[in-house]
Amino acid sequence: SGPEWNRHVFNLENLPARDLWETYLPAFKSLVQDGHVAEVMCAYQRIDGAPCCSNAKFERQILRDEWGFKGLITSDCGAVNDFYMPGYHGTAKTATEATAQAVNAGTDLECGSAYRTIPKAVKAGMINEDKVNQSLKRLLVARFKLGDFDKDETVSWTQIPENVIACKAHKDLAEKIAEEGIVLLQNRNQLLPLNRNQKIVVMGPNANDSIMLRGNYSGYPTSSTTILQGIRNYMKGAEVKYVPACTLTRNEVQES
């Protein structure tokens, strides 16, 4: 985990073991062991000098050996290129060297162009061909399970009718998820001098951003309501002031 704006060069150093195991890893462990996810993605940044996609401690020792993950590990897009591209991590000099580092650490699949050099790396003795075959097997198993090689009429994913799009059940579920994801803080002893029936202050850069409500890897909803819009619609008699307060990726605070 690191700052969004410099994730391609960021190096997380001296992370306390307790913080790693109690703060960062529990969610991933639960997804692997309880949720049985089929695929895990390694991120851009470095941890103690090693990019996540060439970090055997996390990909092999923790993810596979300790947690028992059997699925596919893929890189974030362009992450392996960051190993050797000028001005980035600088852990490799060439795409071939970067590819060898990633494959040997346990990254099965790359989103990018570096893995085109796998044959060259194998011929140079930088990668054992057995590792390539192992990764290929994991990739093919995942695609077989998805039905990529089957006829459309035999694949359940192609049989989903269009009328489920934006259906009531899905909208109700989305609303429930949104409601349960909200954390409410009480204004005890009028710490903030606000009368909830007269004046409401909505703060935060995401309060008036419909894209961030769903994330940047999602479909397009038929309609959406931002937090700010929802509060204004509900509290029509109150003065609702919006203060972005800060930005998501820049180290600055806006005037309120």
Q: Positions of the model-derived regions?
A:
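Glycoside hydrolase catalytic-domain context in secreted enzymes
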Residues: 1-256
